[in-house]
A protein has these predicted regions:
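Conserved adenine-nucleotide phosphate-binding loops and their immediately adjacent elements
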Residues: 1-19, 112-118, 222-245
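Residue-level preference for the first positions of well-ordered beta-strands
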Residues: 22-26, 53, 146-148
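Conserved nucleotide-binding/hydrolysis micro-motifs of P-loop NTPases
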Residues: 31-34, 59-63, 155-156, 183-188
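Conserved phosphate-binding/catalytic loops and adjacent sensor/switch elements of nucleotide-binding enzymes
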Residues: 33-143
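Sensor-1/coupling segment of RecA-like P-loop NTPase cores
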Residues: 146-151, 155-213
Length: 290
């Protein structure tokens, strides 16, 4: 039955896009459930109508990136529907000038770069501006093509992704619909509790949380995961780059989690890393301590 109810929630929001202002809802269920094989997902992905459909399913065992999946949605939609200079697009959306270099480098190479350091007294301001930038770019793209996003296991999201959802709840867009699937049995990171509670409160006030049932018996691999149990690739150069990307997008808590995972591998699993990568790792780790 959970398949039917989950699909029903997705269809309801999909059909509200462009007609109603508030189109963000949460679908809560017990135990684990994957949306990859839902018929409604395949159908909307293959639709040739005017709505851009995207879905993402987070893992319990891997670290979620900063602003995931919104960053890749922005890049994909810009390439497909707008083209041209991504920097000009950012200027049009009012992206803070210090953030454009980070976003441009991610768009072009997948590796974030920033010349200017972040001032300690500017951290909170820059985090707000980055979240606003992500939301404003999504809104601008939705003017070109209405946007439907389904994110399953959303409780595993990074703080930056959750902050983006909160911003979109507070500043709604009729052209964007979002369904957040949440396994109520598994909790997210401690660093996300405060903003998570604010999201739940906002959605509850709007009767936008649906309880769609249980996915069956609890599976052994579904539990709250400690950081040292999260999987990372043993290609440490890649893992360090992923943590560095998260840090450059100012999600310092999530970047610190990534660094702690790498550190655990090095200290307790006798993993080998070359000296150059080790130096870079400690530089990234130190910069997450904001």
């Amino acid at each position: 039955m959970i398949e039917k109810y989950y699909s029903g929630v997705i269809e309801q929001i999909y059909n509200r896009i462009g007609k109603e202002t508030r189109n963000i809802v949460m679908a809560n269920y017990s135990n684990d459930f994957s949306i990859e094989n839902l018929e409604v997902i395949r159908r909307y992905q293959s639709n040739e109508d005017n709505v851009f459909f995207a879905y993402s399913e987070f893992s319990y065992n891997t670290l979620v990136g900063a602003y995931e999946p919104f960053l890749d949605i922005i890049c994909n939609m810009h390439r497909r529907f707008i083209g041209g200079s991504f920097d000009d697009f950012q200027k049009e959306c009012g992206v803070y000038y210090l953030h454009r270099q980070v976003l441009n480098s991610y768009y072009e190479t997948g590796e974030c770069f920033r010349e200017e350091t972040v001032l300690l007294n500017e951290v909170a301001y820059e985090q707000r501006r980055m979240t606003m930038a992500i939301a404003d770019m999504l809104k601008r793209l939705s003017e070109v093509r209405p946007l439907m996003i389904v994110i399953n296991r959303f409780q595993m999201a990074s703080k930056s992704s959750i902050e983006t959802i909160k911003y979109l709840i507070d500043n709604p867009c009729a052209n964007i619909g979002i369904v957040l699937g949440v396994n109520a049995i598994v909790k997210g990171a401690d660093s996300t509790v405060e903003v998570w509670d604010r999201i739940v409160e906002s959605l509850e006030d709007r009767s936008a949380i649906y309880y769609i049932g249980s996915a069956g018996p609890l599976k052994n691999n579904v539990k709250t995961t400690n950081d040292d149990e999260l999987y990372i690739t043993m290609n440490f150069e890649q893992s360090i780059q992923e943590a560095s990307n998260i840090m450059e997008f100012l999600d310092f808590e999530q970047a610190r989690r990534g660094c702690r995972i790498i550190e655990h591998k090095l200290k307790f699993e006798d993993a080998w890393i070359d000296e150059k990568s080790l130096r870079r790792f400690y530089m990234v780790y130190a910069r997450t301590s904001v």
